[in-house]
Design a protein with these regions (language model features):
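N-terminal basic/disordered segments at the start of proteins
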Residues: 10-57, 77-81, 129-134
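Cap/lid and interdomain-hinge subdomains that line or gate substrate/regulatory clefts
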Residues: 14-16, 40, 59, 72-75, ...
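General beta-strand structural signal in soluble alpha/beta enzymes
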Residues: 19, 42-44, 94-98, 126-130, ...
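Short acidic, glycine/serine/threonine-rich loops at helix termini
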Residues: 30-32, 106-110, 137-145, 195-196, ...
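A structural-propensity feature for long, helix-poor, extended segments
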Residues: 58-67, 326-328, 412-447
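Conserved, well-structured core segments that form the ligand-binding/active-site neighborhood
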Residues: 147-322, 327
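C-terminal structural cap/anchor segments
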Residues: 322-383
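Conserved, well-ordered active-site substructure
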Residues: 375-436
Length: 447
């Protein structure tokens, strides 16, 4: 098996773990989970520059790509570039991070990226742990559940980019790879590590491929961390990150108080201004969060793609209202809406055109408002929106701070030279409770 380290690392302190994440909010999710386990973590936006590499001192480095909805060949190319960077940093383990709802299509690209990473690292069998029990994602008999609902009945079947129409992950992943896809089910998990190791060894002896691991509770994650702590390559959601981090801390005899200190580093860039919230997610969780925030009497502005298309001056009005509103209170600007209204806009404008119109509006708002003195910090909800905003602001990396909700921390946004930009929270659409926005603002006020 090929070693992970190719050349001398460009950091004084070598990270033990390198994560390749397929979108920005997903990267922040796993970075937060690593910090929860006591591991100092840096998240980069795309492949980091040499100067940024030189400034990084961390136990884990998360490279955030925007590859989730890309054609498989493009996603593979980006992922292999990230792998090369992480190997140069000297990491001992690679973690391919995707969403806990396994966001993909029959055309890819989880299977193809996994195959490419296996080939590059000469790994015969890739274990997938997609579950995230703390957020209600579990895998039983190879089927992914959101709460008590099968994935394809949870609303994810209506996802505009990656509609998930089959909860059977063995079958779904099998459509994305020519390699064998198998399952280590609950009946094996309950017997313990020895039986799991035996199943993996037998599968590998038969030619290897991909194995989906059942996981229904946190104790299952602890067991999987024990099994996979020395694996050169693992794949899944962020669920496995915290127990892996804790095992690293224990193995290196890191004092408990040091782990606790690392896990609660507050962002240092919180300013006196108010919080700007930009939401492009149309998930049911985000829609509930918006409605809850609206009921507090907060300043909320909705972006309607049909009106944006018909009224070019509308965006200037929204910007003026946002900038003025931030002088007195937090402001939420959202394009999030019901499936019916989203589809109506897509039918009228075209799905791609509607998405780009909204994305550009958020970019304009972020560029104009993010560095104003009345803007204290920024929250962005939705993976695609987060990617667009982060790129527009020239953010190259995130130093992970305190957790707002599982998988969503406050962070310090850094530029390509490692200089501080502002405090930022990137929220995956389905994460957080109904009161998320108010909780985030309250935490920022305490930091």
């Amino acid at each position: 098996m090929r070693t992970l380290t190719e050349t001398k690392a460009c950091v004084v302190r070598k990270p033990f773990l390198g994560v390749i994440a397929d979108d920005y909010t997903g990267a922040t999710d796993i970075a937060s989970m690593l910090v929860r386990g006591g591991v100092a973590t840096i998240q980069t936006i795309g492949i980091p520059s040499q100067s940024l590499c030189d400034s990084m001192k961390a136990d884990a480095v998360v490279i955030a790509l925007k590859s989730r909805a890309l054609p498989a060949a493009d996603a593979v190319a980006q992922s292999l570039a990230a792998l090369s960077c992480l190997r140069n940093l000297g990491v001992r383990q690679i973690y391919f991070k995707y969403c806990s709802t396994f966001d993909s299509t029959p055309a890819g690209n989880i299977g193809q990226v996994g195959d490419a990473l296996c080939a590059a690292l000469e790994v015969s069998t890739l274990i997938h742990i997609p579950a995230l029990p703390v957020n209600g994602r579990s895998v039983y008999q190879g089927h992914l559940f959101v709460g008590t609902t099968l994935l394809h009945q949870s609303g994810m079947e209506n996802h505009p980019l990656n509609p998930m129409t089959d909860a059977n992950l063995v079958r779904w992943l099998g459509r994305q790879t020519r390699r064998t896809v198998g399952l280590i089910g609950t009946s094996v998990i309950t017997k313990g590590r020895a039986d799991i190791d035996t199943e993996i060894a037998a599968f590998t002896a038969g030619g290897g491929g991909h194995l989906i691991g059942d996981t229904v509770q946190d104790s299952d994650l602890e067991l999987w961390a024990q099994v996979l702590q020395s694996a050169p390559l693992v794949a899944g959601s962020s669920g496995l990150a915290t127990p892996l981090a804790r095992r690293y801390m224990a193995a290196h005899q890191m004092p408990a108080e040091m782990a606790e200190r690392k896990a609660k580093i507050p962002p240092q860039t919180v300013r006196n201004g108010h919080t700007l919230i930009l939401s492009g997610s149309c998930s049911s969780a985000t829609l509930a969060q918006i409605e809850t925030f609206r009921t507090t009497g907060a300043h909320c502005i909705q972006l309607d793609p049909l009106r944006l298309s018909a009224e070019p001056a509308l965006l200037d009005e929204v910007l003026e209202s946002t900038v003025t509103g931030l002088k007195n209170a937090p402001v939420l600007v959202y394009a999030s809406d019901s499936l019916h209204k989203v589809q109506a806009a897509q039918n009228a404008l075209g799905a791609v055109a509607a998405g780009k119109l909204v994305e550009q509006a958020f970019v304009t708002l972020a560029q104009a408002a993010a560095r104003l003195p009345q803007t204290g910090q920024l929250i962005v909800a939705g993976g695609e929106t987060s990617g667009a905003v982060v790129a527009a602001l020239g953010i190259a990396a995130l130093r992970i701070g305190p957790e707002i909700a599982p998988g969503v921390p406050w962070t310090e946004a850094l530029d390509a030279q490692g200089a501080l930009v502002l405090s930022l929270a990137l929220k995956s659409g389905n994460f957080g409770g109904d009161g998320f926005f108010s909780q985030a603002i309250e935490l920022a006020g305490r930091a």
